[in-house]
């Protein structure tokens, strides 16, 4: 056991985590040169296309160190985006140490800080690594000082390496082996294994990635899932050397995968503890804190026949992505679907794309909203995650909106622009610290504003240099109203939005203008209105298409023309009474584009 090292690689987006993982795999000979590919751990198509890591992946490698000992390295490559920070905290729970990778050109960014503090809170040893020193813009000395100044870790002798060219990667591994402690745990105690991740395989059922804290587990053992009390038989057990390799047992301190023929998707929830069925452990391991989704949106299959397969797909996906939340909902406009909760907009986009690709579904998404806490006049408090669930205004005592605490790191020259942006988003400044040329800003901004397009706007006002990390702070009373959209006098529940009273007229006006672009013209006038309660605040009309009925009159009598026009008018009127308006998918997402192109 003293030769096992479990560690994660944490860093900001694009600081080179996945490339460093590739090099470590190559040096330890996990894959032959023929099987080696760039970003070998980003196995999902989506990850490769977007060039980001979404799922944390684990690998077990053997490394012969300079002192002649053979070490077993279990490492987990983690995502860098703030939407997937939950994946990071899960990976860290399985480790004793973490490699903090910092780009020697970019320096410390907000995610570096956030992930690093998560690691320190979990009592992990953090080893700083300066990556990308082959770049002409690299300034390792300045960045080392920055790490010390902002993060507070001694980085004077941090390993300098370049994952792309492979310089210094061996030193990184040597440093790891020296500094990260061996796992603790008792090989003879009753089995306790933490489930780090699960996914669904069509042939094997549920496959779980586990980290053994105490005891050991063999192929053929009977194990018990502690939260459900179900007993299963272990069919296969093994490790990843990125490839799945079968072994006969996993011992204390190791990370590997097990297949126990669990068919039920909720059979082995992530964060649960596995123990031996014969002599079970007394108490489960401390799991992970459940994450609360920040953004909710309705997802509906385009054809109602897909509802069943959509439900199965969501089940399989939520097994793999523990932060996804869903419950059935029905809408008068869109039929049956699900209300899903996500950690952020990127997460929502990824989930929607995975559903469409991996499960072949056609989906319509409604615009995302955040959760509001509503106090009723009778003293009840309810949580509202969709505008259609908001009670009537006369029953509401107070609506409280979620406030996010946003930490931003940015170069001084963009400070003015960023502050203007935060004020526009109804933000309140709570802290500002200068670190050399960098400024660290803390703002309290309503979650609804952060979630919508704050990240994109922040990047564009600061030319991509600012970085953001946010977390939920509290609920705070605010003057919020629901803006309904009426099409030809009928309310469309899927288009309603909750917004601040001051922004409502402007938001409503912009929304109806946007909708006008997306709704195709019909044979009759379509009135699009935005209303608060019964009070109409904005209207626009999609003009009808009409045939020129006077074309065949040559000169002629005015009463003849009047007759034809009158006849056409009556026809249009009749049409309008029975006509339906088909809304394209873009119309539902028009809300997202409100306030975008300023």
Curated annotation (Swiss-Prot):
It is found in: Cell inner membrane. One of its GO terms (molecular function) is translation elongation factor activity. Belongs to the TRAFAC class translation factor GTPase superfamily. Classic translation factor GTPase family. LepA subfamily. Keywords: Cell inner membrane, Cell membrane, GTP-binding, Hydrolase, Membrane, Nucleotide-binding, Protein biosynthesis. It is a peripheral membrane protein. It is an enzyme of class 3 (hydrolase). This is Elongation factor 4. GO terms for biological process: positive regulation of translation. NCBIfam families: lepA, small_GTP. It comes from the Bacteria. Residues 2-184 form the tr-type G domain. Signal peptide: none annotated. It catalyses: GTP + H2O = GDP + phosphate + H(+). GO terms for cellular component: plasma membrane. The keyword Cell membrane applies. GTP binds at residues 14-19, 131-134. InterPro entries: EF-4, EFG_III/V, EFG_V-like, EFTu-like_2, G_TR_CS, LepA_C_sf, LepA_CTD, LepA_IV.
């Amino acid at each position: 056991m003293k030769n096992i090292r479990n560690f994660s690689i944490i860093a900001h987006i694009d600081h080179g985590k996945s490339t460093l993982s590739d090099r470590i795999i190559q040096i330890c000979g996990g894959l032959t040169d023929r099987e080696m590919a760039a970003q070998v751990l980003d196995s999902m198509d989506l990850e490769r296309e977007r060039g980001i890591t979404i799922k944390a992946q684990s690998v077990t490698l053997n490394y012969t160190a300079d002192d002649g000992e053979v070490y077993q390295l279990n490492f987990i490559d983690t995502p860098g985006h703030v939407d997937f920070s939950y994946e990071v905290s899960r990976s860290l729970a399985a480790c004793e140490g973490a490699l903090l990778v910092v780009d020697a050109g970019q320096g410390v960014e907000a995610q570096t800080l956030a992930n690093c503090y998560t690691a320190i809170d979990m009592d992990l040893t953090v080893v700083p690594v300066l990556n990308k020193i082959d770049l002409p813009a690299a300034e390792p000395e300045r960045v080392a000082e920055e790490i010390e100044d902002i993060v507070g870790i001694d980085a004077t002798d941090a390993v300098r390496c370049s994952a792309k060219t492979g310089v210094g990667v061996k030193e990184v591994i040597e440093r790891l082996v020296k500094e990260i402690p061996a796992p603790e745990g008792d090989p003879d105690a009753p089995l306790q294994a933490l489930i780090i991740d699960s996914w669904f395989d069509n042939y094997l059922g549920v496959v779980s990635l586990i980290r053994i804290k105490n005891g050991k587990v063999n192929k053929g053992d009977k194990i018990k899932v502690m939260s459900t009390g179900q007993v299963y038989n272990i069919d296969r057990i093994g490790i990843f050397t990125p490839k799945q390799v079968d072994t006969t047992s996993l011992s204390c301190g190791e990370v590997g995968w097990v297949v126990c023929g669990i068919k039920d998707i909720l059979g082995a929830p992530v964060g649960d503890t596995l123990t031996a069925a014969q002599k079970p452990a007394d108490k489960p391991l401390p799991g992970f804190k459940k994450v609360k989704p920040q953004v909710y949106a309705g997802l509906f299959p385009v054809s109602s026949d897909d509802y069943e397969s959509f439900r199965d797909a969501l089940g399989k996906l939520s097994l793999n992505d523990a932060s996804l939340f869903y419950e059935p909902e029905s809408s008068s406009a869109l039929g049956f679907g699900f209300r899903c909760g996500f950690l952020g907009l990127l997460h929502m986009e990824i989930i929607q794309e995975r559903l469409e690709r991996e499960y072949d579904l056609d989906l319509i998404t409604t615009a995302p909203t955040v959760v509001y806490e509503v106090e009723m006049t009778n003293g009840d408090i309810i949580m509202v995650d969709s505008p259609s669930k908001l009670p009537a205004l006369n029953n509401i005592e107070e609506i409280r909106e979620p406030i996010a605490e946003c930490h931003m790191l940015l170069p001084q020259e963009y400070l003015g622009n960023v502050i203007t942006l935060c004020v526009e988003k109804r933000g309140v400044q709570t802290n500002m610290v200068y670190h050399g040329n960098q400024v660290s800003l803390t703002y309290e901004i309503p979650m609804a504003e952060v979630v919508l397009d704050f990240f994109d706007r922040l990047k564009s006002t600061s030319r991509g240099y600012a970085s953001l990390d946010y977390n939920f702070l509290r609920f705070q009373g605010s003057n919020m109203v629901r803006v309904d959209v009426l099409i030809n006098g009928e309310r469309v529940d899927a288009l309603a939005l909750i917004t601040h009273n001051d922004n409502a007229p402007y938001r409503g006006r912009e929304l109806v203008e946007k909708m006008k672009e997306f709704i195709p013209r019909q044979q009759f006038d379509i009135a699009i209105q935005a209303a608060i309660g019964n009070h109409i605040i904005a209207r626009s009309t999609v003009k009808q298409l009409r045939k020129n009925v006077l074309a065949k009159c040559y000169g002629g009598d005015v009463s003849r023309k009047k007759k034809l026009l009158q006849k056409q008018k009556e026809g249009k009127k009749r049409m309008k009474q029975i006509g339906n308006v088909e809304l394209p998918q873009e119309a539902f997402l028009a809300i997202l584009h409100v306030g975008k192109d300023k």
